[in-house]
Regions:
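Hydrophobic anchor at the beta1->P-loop junction of P-loop NTPases
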Residues: 21
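NTP-dependent small-molecule kinase module
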Residues: 35, 39, 149-180
Length: 180
């Protein structure tokens, strides 16, 4: 674990020192990201907004026009090209399907998985399509959750259990666990 921590610190210091938040929609990536960025004196980047700016379309419009696979290709390409420094990046929940995007994000910063139970996520979410959540026909949120969690865990440098914690507590835990 010490070797892993030391390696993480090297990446953090040598690279662009970004903090990348991954997790299910509704896990709090954008909310935590804004507070974390402010506290660390970092910029805040919402990759979903970058996608919307670069395509000129809302997420659900991309999904309607290009389908789920088309959306994921756009998401993968744009995240793989993100060139930011000293930023907290809140990613879209499906970013973990893009291998190029995740390899790039791991190269430019520390990947932090905001973990929350499926029940808590379901309670927070409204219209899934408007949130850019791509469920296949007949797929439940639980099935999507079960599909994505192993990917979040695989790519995470740090996993933060967000269950029953305030934004302030989550941010404090992230800061405490960052490489020194």
């Amino acid at each position: 674990d010490l070797v892993r921590s030391r390696g993480l610190g090297d990446v953090y210091k040598r690279q662009m020192k970004n903090l990348i938040l991954i997790g299910m929609p509704g896990a709090g990536k954008s909310t935590v990201g804004v507070v974390l960025a402010k506290q660390q004196g970092y910029h805040f980047v919402d990759s979903d907004l970058v996608i919307q700016e670069q395509t000129g379309l809302l997420l659900h419009e991309i999904i309607e026009q290009q389908g789920d696979d088309g959306f994921r290709q756009v998401e993968n390409r744009i995240n793989a090209d993100l060139a930011v420094k000293h930023s907290v990046i809140a990613t879209g929940g499906s970013v973990i399907y893009g291998r190029e995007a995740m390899q790039h994000l791991k190269k430019i910063g520390v990947v932090i998985y905001l973990k929350l139970s499926c029940e808590s996520i379901a309670a927070r979410l409204g219209d899934l399509r408007k949130r850019g959540i791509t469920l296949r026909e007949g797929q439940t949120l639980q099935q999507l959750y079960d599909e994505r969690v192993p990917l979040y865990e695989r790519y995470a440098d740090i996993t933060v259990d967000c269950e029953n914690k305030s934004i302030r507590e989550i941010v404090a835990e992230i800061v405490a666990r960052l490489p020194k």
